[in-house]
């Protein structure tokens, strides 16, 4: 049987460039673990921080070293690697803006070649927290109270900014969390306990994104569920995250030992089933495909399960929950990567 040529795309222009490299290195290792080498040939494509694409020796060196390369010459930005023409299926491992927001998905869609993960709509809805919450509300999925804010409201007029803060005081209260709407890995998030902190947090978030979401704080356990599939997705076991910091921030996520993970989570059976059902419903609501990780708050005092967010292109690092959840569910890493590629081929197959 002829091997499928898998284009592994990683790096990118976002602040999660290094995380992308780490994830891609893990995926590449899984594709080189039996029986996958008999089925796939991996062709890595590295996107520099300035947007230049490179394949071949440079991309292989980045994977081998696990760290970014010096920026390519600006003149090479518009020269797409010739190796792209021979790819049978793309595997984008790009996190943050331009990677999981529908941008790269649109490019791959234009190539008319299958690719792993959600399409343009699912990726965009899963990236923008305001759009995501709007979809969740329409699907009847319970979530914490929130307010949306724009950069213009924060920076353009002091009177408008005061009105925004007054509204948040009244509808959300404290503590709350201020988040850029379109960044992942907890980049740019602030926990806010007072009006003064709110003003500073909004100003900070506006420097990251033109759209901002403010969410009510809640005393709850943080749990996650992985989803795998296309039209008939299935949910993994549920995992729980515990940490000593104020919230699950970037450093805690990607530093081993900073967070405690328990898989499966010690939850009542009915709560576990509810989380799994809600995870699948969220996956369908945003029109996701292939894979997603869905995060929840479990309010133990009331028995409520509140959806937090969906991540349509979760990490594949050694501390990433998505592959760990599936491993405990009986799908090891090489088998998971193999399944994701097969799902991509199935999803993009021409309709009969």
UniProtKB/Swiss-Prot annotation:
Mg(2+) 1 binds at residues 295, 309. Keywords: ATP-binding, Cell shape, Cell wall biogenesis/degradation, Cytoplasm, Ligase, Magnesium, Manganese, Metal-binding, Nucleotide-binding, Peptidoglycan synthesis. ATP binds at residues 169-224. One of its GO terms (cellular component) is cytosol. Pathway: Cell wall biogenesis; peptidoglycan biosynthesis. Its cofactor is Mg(2+); Mn(2+). One of its GO terms (biological process) is peptidoglycan biosynthetic process. Binds 2 magnesium or manganese ions per subunit. It catalyses: 2 D-alanine + ATP = D-alanyl-D-alanine + ADP + phosphate + H(+). It is found in: Cytoplasm. Residues 133-342 form the ATP-grasp domain. GO terms for molecular function: ATP binding; D-alanine-D-alanine ligase activity; metal ion binding. Mg(2+) 2 binds at residues 309, 311. SUPFAM superfamilies: Glutathione synthetase ATP-binding domain-like, PreATP-grasp domain. It is an enzyme of class 6 (ligase). It holds the Pfam family Dala_Dala_lig_C. Its EC number is 6.3.2.4. Gene3D superfamilies: 3.40.50.20, ATP-grasp fold, A domain, ATP-grasp fold, B domain. PROSITE patterns: ATP_GRASP (PS50975), DALA_DALA_LIGASE_1 (PS00843), DALA_DALA_LIGASE_2 (PS00844). Cell wall formation. Belongs to the D-alanine--D-alanine ligase family. HAMAP family: Dala_Dala_lig. NCBIfam families: D_ala_D_alaTIGR, PRK01372.1, PRK01966.1-4. This is D-alanine--D-alanine ligase. It comes from Acaryochloris marina (strain MBIC 11017). The gene is ddl.
């Amino acid at each position: 049987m002829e091997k499928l040529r898998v284009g592994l795309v990683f790096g990118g222009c976002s602040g999660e460039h290094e995380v992308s490299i780490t994830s891609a290195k893990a995926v590449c290792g899984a594709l080189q673990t039996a029986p996958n080498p008999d089925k796939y040939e991996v062709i890595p494509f590295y996107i520099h921080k300035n947007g230049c694409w490179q394949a071949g020796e440079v991309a292989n060196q980045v994977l081998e070293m696990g760290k970014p390369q010096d920026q390519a010459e600006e003149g090479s930005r518009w020269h797409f690697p010739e190796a792209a023409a021979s790819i049978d299926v793309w595997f984008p491992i790009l996190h943050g803006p331009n990677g999981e927001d529908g941008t790269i998905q649109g490019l791959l869609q234009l190539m008319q070649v299958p690719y792993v993960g959600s399409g343009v709509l699912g990726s965009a809805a899963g990236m923008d927290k305001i759009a995501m919450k709007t979809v969740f509300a329409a699907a009847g999925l319970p979530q914490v109270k929130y307010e949306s804010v724009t950069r213009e409201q924060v920076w353009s007029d002091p009177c408008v900014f005061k009105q925004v803060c007054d509204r948040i005081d009244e509808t959300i209260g404290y503590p709350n969390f201020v988040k850029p709407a379109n960044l992942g890995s907890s980049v740019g998030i602030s926990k806010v306990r007072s009006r003064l902190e709110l003003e500073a947090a909004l100003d900070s978030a506006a420097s990251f994104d033109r759209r901002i979401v403010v969410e009510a704080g809640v005393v709850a356990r943080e749990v996650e569920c992985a989803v795998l599939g296309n039209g008939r997705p299935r949910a993994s076991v549920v995992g729980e995250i515990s940490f000593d910091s104020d919230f699950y921030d970037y450093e805690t996520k990607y530093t081993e030992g900073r967070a405690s993970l328990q898989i499966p989570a010690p939850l009542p059976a009915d709560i576990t089933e509810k989380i799994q059902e809600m995870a699948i419903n969220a996956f369908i609501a945003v029109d996701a495909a292939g894979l997603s990780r869905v995060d929840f708050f479990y309010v133990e005092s009331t028995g409520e399960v509140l959806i937090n967010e969906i991540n349509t292109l979760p990490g594949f690092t050694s501390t990433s929950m998505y592959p760990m959840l599936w491993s405990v569910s009986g799908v090891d890493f090489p088998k998971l990567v193999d399944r994701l590629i097969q799902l991509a081929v199935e999803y993009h197959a021409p309709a009969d």
